[in-house]
A protein has these predicted regions:
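Conserved H-loop
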Residues: 24
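Short, aliphatic-rich beta-strand segments
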Residues: 37-41
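Catalytic core of pol beta-like nucleotidyltransferases
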Residues: 1-18, 27-32, 42-99
Length: 99
């Protein structure tokens, strides 16, 4: 988790992006084969077409280097807020650890 947290700090030191760990790793229920679920929330107005490559893909790459599966999902703040009544949103909110 240290490498993931360090990458988040490096990538987003001057930006308006938040990265959260959720799922089994956040709950402390992970097994060796568990993936790392990351929610990336960017400010509204971010060029979402290029945002995945800029904000999410580096986590996928570091996962390959570490031999881990990292699964990032990306939303803008308003997109994430629109998910408020979904089971996914509620599960993430229950588990989320800000990196």
């Amino acid at each position: 988790m240290t490498a993931i947290r360090d990458l988040a700090k490096e990538l987003f030191v001057d930006s308006k992006v938040s990265v959260y760990l959720y799922g089994s790793r956040a709950r402390g229920e992970a097994v060796n084969s568990s993936d790392w679920d990351l929610l990336i929330v960017a400010e509204d107005g971010v060029d979402i077409e290029n945002a995945f490559e800029k904000y999410a893909y580096p986590f996928t790459e570091i996962g390959w280097k570490l031999g881990e599966q990292i699964t990032p999902v990306l939303y803008t703040k308003s997109e994430w807020a629109a998910e408020e009544h979904t089971a996914f949103y509620m599960n993430v909110q229950n588990d989320a650890i800000l990196l």
